[in-house]
C-alpha cells in the first residue's frame, strides 16, 4: 500500500550544520496496517512523515502509494488522499469558522469548488452523526466557532476532518503530546476506533512507549534516520516497556534513552 525505497534526506547539505535525517530508509505498509513509530529526538520520525506527505523533496529514493509513484508529487496534490493530524491542536482547523463549516472544508478537499459555497442540510445531518460518534457533545454545537473549543475537542475534530473522506493513508504526528493525560487517552482511543472502522492504513509517531506497544498491529523504532527495530504479531503483543528500553539500548549503543522517549 505504502512503499518507501531507500529514501534519504539531508538538511543543510554542504555546510557544517549538515545533518542526514533519513538514511536510505525502506519501509512497506500493507493496507489497513496501524504502525506506531518511536525513537529519540532527531531519530527522523517527523522527517519520515513529512517526506511521505510531500512537505519537502527527498534527496534520493522512491515513495509509492497504492503502486503510484508520488515521489515528486507536490504536497497539495497528496493532500487529496492523505489525512494528517499534527501535535498542535491549533493546526488543521479554521478557528473563526463553525464546526460544520470546518467539516465541509475537509469533505470537499481536492474537489473543484464553484462560486456557491455553503453547508447543505444533508451535509449537516451527516456531520451530526459523525460528531456524535466522538462522544464529546459536539453534534449539539455545530454552529460554534472552532476557536472556542478546548484543545482536546479541537484535536478530536481535526482527527475527524482528516478522516472524513477516508484517506488512503492517515499520518498522526505526536497528535496527543500537547494534551493532558485523560484527554490524550480519549483522542488515542478515537484514533484507533476510526482507523479500525474505516480500515485506514495509519502511521503514528509517539514518544509514549506504552502507547506504542498498546496501539496498532506493528511497531517500528528509528535511530539515526534508519529503522532499527520492526516488530509485529505475537512478538509485539508480548512486549513490555522494559523490553523496549533494553532493545533500544542494544541497537542504539546508548545506556539509556532520552527522558522524553521514556514517558509512559
Residue ranges with predicted function:
Residues 226-252:
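Conserved beta-strand-loop-alpha-helix hinge in the C-terminal portion
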Residues 38-40:
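The feature captures the beta-strand-to-loop junction immediately N-terminal to the Walker
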Residues 162-163:
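ABC ATPase C-loop
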Residues 1, 10-24, 74:
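A short, flexible loop at the N-terminus of ABC-type nucleotide-binding domains that lies
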Residues 61-68, 229-231:
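Conserved ABC transporter NBD signature motif
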Residues 53:
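Helix-to-loop junction immediately C-terminal to a conserved catalytic motif
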Residues 15-16, 57, 69-83, 91, ...:
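ABC ATPase NBD coupling module
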Residues 206-207:
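H-loop/switch region of ABC-family ATPase nucleotide-binding domains
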Amino acid at each position: 500500500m505504502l512503499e518507501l525505497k531507500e529514501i534519504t534526506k539531508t538538511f543543510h547539505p554542504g555546510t557544517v550544520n549538515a545533518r542526514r535525517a533519513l538514511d536510505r530508509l525502506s519501509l512497506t505498509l500493507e493496507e489497513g496496517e496501524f504502525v506506531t513509530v518511536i525513537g529519540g529526538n532527531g531519530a527522523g520520525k517527523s522527517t519520515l512523515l513529512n517526506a511521505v506527505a510531500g512537505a519537502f523533496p527527498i534527496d534520493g529514493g522512491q515513495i509509492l502509494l497504492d503502486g503510484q509513484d508520488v515521489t515528486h508529487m507536490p504536497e497539495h496534490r497528496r493532500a487529496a488522499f492523505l489525512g494528517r493530524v499534527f501535535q498542535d491542536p491549533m493546526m488543521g482547523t479554521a478557528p473563526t469558522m463553525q464546526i460544520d463549516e470546518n467539516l465541509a472544508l475537509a469533505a470537499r478537499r481536492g474537489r473543484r469548488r464553484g462560486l456557491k459555497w455553503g453547508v447543505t442540510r444533508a451535509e449537516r445531518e451527516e456531520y451530526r452523526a459523525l460528531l456524535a460518534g466522538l462522544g464529546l457533545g459536539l453534534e449539539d454545537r455545530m454552529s460554534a466557532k472552532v476557536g472556542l473549543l478546548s484543545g482536546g475537542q479541537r484535536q478530536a475534530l481535526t482527527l475527524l476532518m482528516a478522516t472524513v473522506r477516508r484517506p488512503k493513508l492517515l499520518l498522526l504526528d505526536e497528535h496527543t503530546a500537547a494534551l493532558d493525560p485523560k484527554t490524550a487517552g480519549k483522542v488515542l482511543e478515537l484514533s484507533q476506533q476510526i482507523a479500525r472502522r474505516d480500515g485506514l492504513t495509519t502511521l503514528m509517531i509517539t514518544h509514549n512507549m506504552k502507547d506504542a506497544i498498546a496501539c496498532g498491529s506493528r511497531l517500528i523504532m528509528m535511530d539515526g534516520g534508519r529503522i532499527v527495530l520492526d516488530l509485529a504479531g505475537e512478538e509485539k503483543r508480548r512486549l513490555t516497556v522494559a523490553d523496549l528500553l533494553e532493545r533500544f539500548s542494544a541497537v542504539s549503543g546508548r545506556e539509556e534513552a532520552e527522558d522524553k522517549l521514556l514517558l509512559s
